[in-house]
Amino acid sequence: MMFNKFICASAVLMMSALAYGCTSLPESSRTATIHDVKVEEKLSPSTIRVQPGDEVRWVNVRKLPVQVEVPTVTTDDLSCQRGFSNWMGSFREIGRIKPNETVALCFKKPAIINYSVRAETSLGGGMQVLPGTVEVGGR
């Protein structure tokens, strides 16, 4: 009986530690300034200027899913994220967006972030790559 209590207590402790270790970045902007990038046949706008802490939100207005890829970004560069985490809450560099849905990132410090959006197309090749840039801070 005592052994069962020990196992239960250990399991609860492990689950608590796992939940604490998997905490991720906040899902909203601290500055409350949100900048939308619409994903259509092209990005609108393809270059966006924001301040540190602002939220950049990609909006998929296409009829099929797309994915936003930010290969040079790490969690150290971010103050918030939504849609760029795996099932354990860890950041990943690809955010998948269903039609009429969004993903978002908030950048901590001045930087120039080049990203791309991959979208299915009826044109030859099957995938269209739409390049974009986020300029954080500065002017």
Feature-to-residue mapping (PLM):
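Bacterial N-terminal signal peptides that target proteins for export
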Residues: 1-10
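N-terminal edge beta-strand
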Residues: 26-56
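A mature extracytoplasmic/lumenal domain signature
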Residues: 41, 60-64, 70-74, 109-111, ...
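Beta-strand cores of secreted/periplasmic/IMS beta-sandwich domains, seen most often
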Residues: 46-69, 102-109
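Short aromatic-acidic-glycine turn motif
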Residues: 74-83
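Extracellular/periplasmic metallocenter environments
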Residues: 89-139
